[in-house]
Curated annotation (Swiss-Prot):
This is Peptidyl-prolyl cis-trans isomerase FKBP12. PROSITE patterns: FKBP_PPIASE. It is found in: Cytoplasm. The gene is FKBP12. Disulfide bonds join 26-80.
Length: 112
């Protein structure tokens, strides 16, 4: 599967380019294998938007590839197969089981 994108709200700006610092709001779903269960959000109390260098492998592959295909201001849901998420190791601290399909709702706030 890789990464599948469903647009929730279209963007109006340009797509990010590899190597840019991209800032996003993100909510991740798939805790304990249940795609309706949130495991993390930048919108939770005490959290802030997340910034990463796109296309450099600093985040999961689903984010690197999925966000490259998004426009500034776009909100989309990305469904990531295990090999595009946390793979065989999962992410136990967040309740992500090994080989889990995950979904992320991402809003692209900035790219520079």
């Amino acid at each position: 599967m890789g990464v599948e994108k469903q647009i929730i709200r279209a963007g109006t700006g340009p797509n990010p380019s590899r190597g840019q610092n991209v800032t996003v709001h993100c909510t991740g779903y798939g805790k304990n294998g249940d795609l309706s269960q949130k495991f993390w959000s930048t919108k939770d109390p005490g959290q802030n938007p997340f910034t990463f260098k796109i296309g450099q492998g600093s985040v999961i592959k689903g984010w690197d590839e999925g966000v490259l295909g998004m426009q500034l201001g776009e909100v989309a849901r990305l469904r990531c197969s295990p090999d595009y998420a946390y793979g065989a190791g999962g992410f136990p601290a967040w309740g992500i089981q090994p080989n889990s399909v995950l979904e992320f709702e991402i809003e692209v706030l900035r790219a520079q």
